[in-house]
A protein has these predicted regions:
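Short loop/turn motifs at secondary-structure junctions
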Residues: 25, 96-98, 209
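Flexible mid-to-C-terminal extensions adjoining Fe-S/redox cofactors in radical SAM and related proteins
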Residues: 176-255
Length: 255
């Protein structure tokens, strides 16, 4: 069966657009935020005039959360992690925290040299647990139990593609707009080039340390993009906090 989702900044996600997406069988929408208004508006303003965007996005989420399944992804690093509770509280104050999904995700360091503002996976695993605990103590259920996966992500699936605004096809979010990783176009079809070959021939688990790891069914060796392009083999945060997540999930059942 066919399924599709979109990732958007949420600025143009009006009710009319939401109904159009629904008709096209696009039920799931991920909206990426960088923090509460004061942080988000500093990082994600309009190109024309640097006007703020947060308030418009929040209104759109309120208008559309009963039409589509909306997932709020909060990008976090060492400079904005302290504000993520305030962001979640915005949805609580507006009465929609139970009508959306909310999770935090570390800003990816895709450079060859470590960025001091980005969390390592070990650092993020600790921040994630502290965040979950704070949410639990406030009576919020946002802890999701990790489940075994059968494919690391859509990047290595032969039948999954990302489409950018120009109609170009890519295999990974991190590759979008980088033309050297383009694998075709919706109008001309898929191009069986080097970029596509790297993903389709990717071996998810080819390291000895992964073979004997109890977390292997939950991560399958980590991010293919980082492993292929940057040769990074940093263990998933689940390596460090899987047992804590299960505990917090159990506790959340009684919240």
């Amino acid at each position: 069966s066919y399924s599709a989702s979109i990732v958007t900044n949420g600025y143009l996600l009006t009710k009319d657009v939401a109904y159009q997406l629904k008709k096209l069988d696009i039920d799931n929408v991920q909206i990426t935020l960088d923090g509460p208004a004061k942080i988000h508006n500093e990082r994600r303003y309009l190109k024309a005039g640097k006007k703020p965007t947060f308030e418009t996005i929040l209104k759109n989420v309120k208008d559309c959360c009963e039409i589509l399944n909306i997932n709020i992804r909060a990008n976090v690093d060492k400079t904005n992690m302290s504000c993520v509770d305030e962001l979640f509280e915005e949805f609580n104050k507006n009465g929609i925290k139970d009508k959306i999904s909310f999770y935090i995700s570390p800003v990816s360091d895709i450079s060859e040299n470590p960025n001091p503002k980005c969390f390592t996976n070990l650092e993020f695993s600790k921040e994630q647990m502290e965040f979950y605990l704070r949410m639990l103590n406030k009576g919020n259920k946002i802890v999701a139990i990790p489940k075994p996966i059968y494919g690391v992500c859509s990047a290595i699936s032969p039948f999954s593609f990302l489409i950018d605004p120009l109609g170009d096809l890519y295999k990974c979010w991190n590759d979008v707009s980088r033309k050297e990783f383009r694998v075709g176009n919706v109008y001309t079809g898929v191009e069986y080039n080097t970029a596509l070959s790297k993903y389709l021939n990717y071996e998810a688990v080819n390291q000895e340390k992964c073979m004997h790891c109890s977390v292997l069914p939950l991560c399958l060796g980590g991010c293919p993009n980082e492993n292929i392009l940057l040769n990074k083999r940093e263990c998933s945060p689940l390596k460090y906090n899987a047992s804590n997540i299960v505990e917090y999930y159990y506790r959340s059942l009684n919240v």
